[in-house]
Amino acid sequence: MLKDNRRAYEHEQIMRDYDMVIKLNPGFVYAYFNRANLRCAQRDFRAAIVDYNEAIERDPEFAEAYYNRGLARLSQGDVNRGIADLSKAGELGIYNAYSIIKRMTSR
């Protein structure tokens, strides 16, 4: 219980740090990406997707952001858009995205 409370507190602190980084430097793409990853860890996929969108808007070639946004969309049940993101990630060099697409489409 104490460990869970500590982890929640740490996540809140980290989230505030990312918020501050974004406020100070809104163009810093990795702040959005890392905040999105933290939100995924907290299973807040909707908010994570918003942050991945921001990262991709700032760097349209950010393969990892497409990949992670695709996984977040799949976690929400948005299969078509998740697969589209994974496909884009594959095009940008994350080739294991194709194996996830293959598993999703062979069901």
Language model regions located:
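Alpha-helical tetratricopeptide repeat
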Residues: M1-R107
